[in-house]
From Swiss-Prot:
Heme b b566 binds at residues 97, 196. The cytochrome bc1 complex contains 3 respiratory subunits (MT-CYB, CYC1 and UQCRFS1), 2 core proteins (UQCRC1 and UQCRC2) and probably 6 low-molecular weight proteins. It is a multi-pass membrane protein. SUPFAM superfamilies: a domain/subunit of cytochrome bc1 complex (Ubiquinol-cytochrome c reductase), Transmembrane di-heme cytochromes. Coiled coil: none annotated. One of its GO terms (biological process) is mitochondrial electron transport, ubiquinol to cytochrome c. Heme b b562 binds at residues 83, 182. GO terms for cellular component: mitochondrial inner membrane; respiratory chain complex III. This is Cytochrome b. It comes from the Eukaryota.
Length: 379
């Protein structure tokens, strides 16, 4: 029986990924977020499945069906709160996972990193179409504003928007297809995650010092399986606390009002995890320019490995680059704050400065400082 996991065609795959996987002995808690993201995905698929059993994707009943889930379905309120707040935890883990990759130079595993960026985009798309489903005011107007951005595409823009809407405005056809997409995408994400892991296990994990750790590897189980379990407990406890005590803390009050195409909410803004990208979008006065900046804010991650100039992999022994990293973190927080603010002075100029700094850090300052550090160390 002990060797069945090493010989059985299916168990062998799981064994090589979760049990006998050679893992660097010095990876810190920052390496927990990959498995936490897996847990988030499973949790979201399960809670989402139970919600889909009671939800109706029709504009006349969608809002009522969500109310029905919360009032009449056994533990429906809990499932809904876990699902809505689970999305927030998903993005918290995502941002920390990406930050870890940027800090320790994990992006030099190019295939793993690029699939990771694609995964990030897929999760963002999933969250966006999911936010439309309750059919509240912010759902409707968020869908209208964000889908309208496609009209900035030259020549085919307007046709593209109407094609996505399934008509001349966000309507029943839009809601129905968004529900279909929201059901489908998590499984696409799960598939892409398998690829992400496949490429990661070709090279093995990076580690905090950024050196080859082949000489000092330990089995994943029991060491890191138990370490991950601690992370699971902490995250599930935090999620449960949020869902039970402050379920609406991160939501928008406007979404408790049923969608009304005749009334525009005073401030249209996405969920908190998209605010940084929304701030970058708004900081450019031109529509097409804003859309390109929005896309670039995510796709800039793909050029990070190409612009890596340092002879060292991570930032562990590079104080100047560490400073830039923490400036980037602060800049993201400023952009998140600005994204939730009205478009007026002084928020406009703060957003524009923060957006310029965001791209400068990735495209100019980091490569430059990496090169300078090489010079200082006589490499």
């Amino acid at each position: 029986m002990a060797n069945l996991r090493k010989t059985h065609p299916l168990l062998k795959i799981a064994n090589d990924a979760l049990v006998d996987l050679p893992t660097p002995s010095n990876i810190s808690a920052w390496w927990n977020f990959g498995s936490l993201l897996g847990l988030c995905l499973i949790s979201q698929i399960l809670t989402g499945l139970f919600l889909a059993m009671h939800y109706t994707s029709d504009i006349s009943t969608a809002f009522s069906s969500v109310a029905h889930i919360c009032r009449d379905v056994n533990y429906g309120w809990l499932i809904r709160n876990l699902h809505a707040n689970g999305a927030s935890f998903f993005f918290i883990c995502l941002y920390l996972h990406i930050a870890r990759g940027l800090y320790y130079g994990s992006y030099l595993y190019m295939e793993t990193w690029n699939i990771g960026v694609v995964l990030f985009l897929l999760v963002m798309m999933t969250a966006f179409v999911g936010y439309v489903l309750p059919w509240g005011q912010m759902s409707f107007w968020g869908a209208t504003v964000i889908t309208n951005l496609l009209s900035a595409v030259p020549y085919v823009g307007n046709s593209l928007v109407q094609w996505i809407w399934g008509g001349f405005s966000v309507d029943n056809a839009t809601l129905t297809r968004f529900f279909a997409f929201h059901f489908l995408f998590p499984f696409v994400v799960a598939g892409a995650t398998m690829l992400h892991l496949l490429f990661l296990h070709e090279t093995g994990s990076n580690n905090p010092v950024g050196l080859n750790s082949d000489a000092d590897k330990i089995p994943f189980h029991p060491y890191f399986s138990y370490k991950d379990l601690l992370g699971f407990i902490i995250m599930l406890t935090a999620l449960t606390m949020l869902a039970l005590f402050y379920p609406n803390l991160l939501g928008d009050p406007d979404n408790f009002t049923p969608a009304n195409p005749m009334v525009t909410p005073p401030h249209i803004k996405p969920e908190w995890y998209f605010l940084f990208a929304y701030a970058i979008l708004r900081s450019i006065p031109n529509k097409l320019g804003g859309v390109l900046a929005l896309l670039s804010s995510i796709l800039v991650l793909m050029v990070v490995p190409i612009l890596h100039t340092s002879k060292q992999r991570g930032l562990t022994f590079r104080p100047a680059s560490q400073l830039l990293f923490w400036i980037l973190v602060a800049d993201m927080l400023v952009l998140t704050w600005i994204g939730g603010m009205p478009v007026e002075h002084p928020y406009i100029i703060i957003g524009q400065v923060a957006s310029v700094l965001y791209f400068s850090l990735f495209l100019v300052l980091n490569p430059l400082v990496g090169w300078l550090e090489n010079k200082v160390m006589n490499w």
